[in-house]
C-alpha cells in the first residue's frame, strides 16, 4: 500500500518474524479469506434481498444496486498482483450505496452458481454470508489468486503455518484445495488451525475436520 499502517512497516514485520523464529518461536499468520472490505469503486450489481435469519429465503425479486465490489488497490499500481477483484469474485454484499441501505444481498448475476456455497451446517439456513463482500470460492480465478497470494506471503515472511479465520462460513472443499496447494508449494508439514465458532457443538467441529480430511486442526470452541 501507499500509507504506513499503525502496525508498523513491512520491514519491521519481516524483522519481527525472523527474530521470533531465531528464538525458537513458530509464527502462524492470521489469514482471513472469507470476506473483503474497503473497495474503492462501485459497480452495478443484480441482487436479491435475503432473510437474515434464513439465508436460503430470498425476500425480493432480483433488482439492481450499486455496491462497493471493485478493489483496484491504486496505491500498489499492480506491484504485487494485477488481479482485479470485482463483483464476479463475490457472492453477497451488505450495503447498497445508491439506496443507503444495509441488508444482506445475494448477488444473482453470478456465473458460478445461484445462492450460497454448500457448508457442513444449516445454521441460519446457510451461514456462508458473514459480512462485507463475501468471497466467491466457486470462481476458479479467485481460488488461483488466493493460492498465488499465499505463496507470495510465504516468500515475504517465511511463516510456519496459519490461523484460519471464520472457517464455518467457508466451504471445506476450498480449504482442501488451498491447503493442498500451499503444502505442495511450501512445506508438506505446514501447520493450520481453523476458527470454527460453535461453542457446545463438538460433533459439528468433528464433522468439519472430517470434511477437510484432517488437513487442519480446530480451536476447541466448546471450552468457551
Regions found by a protein language model. Give the residues of each.
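Core domains of carbohydrate- and sulfate-ester-processing enzymes
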Residues: 47-126
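Aromatic/hydrophobic pocket-lining residues that form the small-molecule binding cavity
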Residues: 9, 13, 146, 175
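The substrate-binding groove and active-site-proximal loops of carbohydrate-active enzymes
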Residues: 1-10, 93, 128-143, 160-169
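Extracellular structured ligand-interaction cores
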Residues: 24-28, 68, 80-86, 94, ...
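Lipid deacylating catalytic domains
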Residues: 120-123, 131-132, 153
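Active-site-proximal helices and loops of the catalytic beta/alpha 8
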Residues: 17, 21, 35, 48-50, ...
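Substrate-binding cleft of carbohydrate-active enzyme catalytic domains
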Residues: 5-39
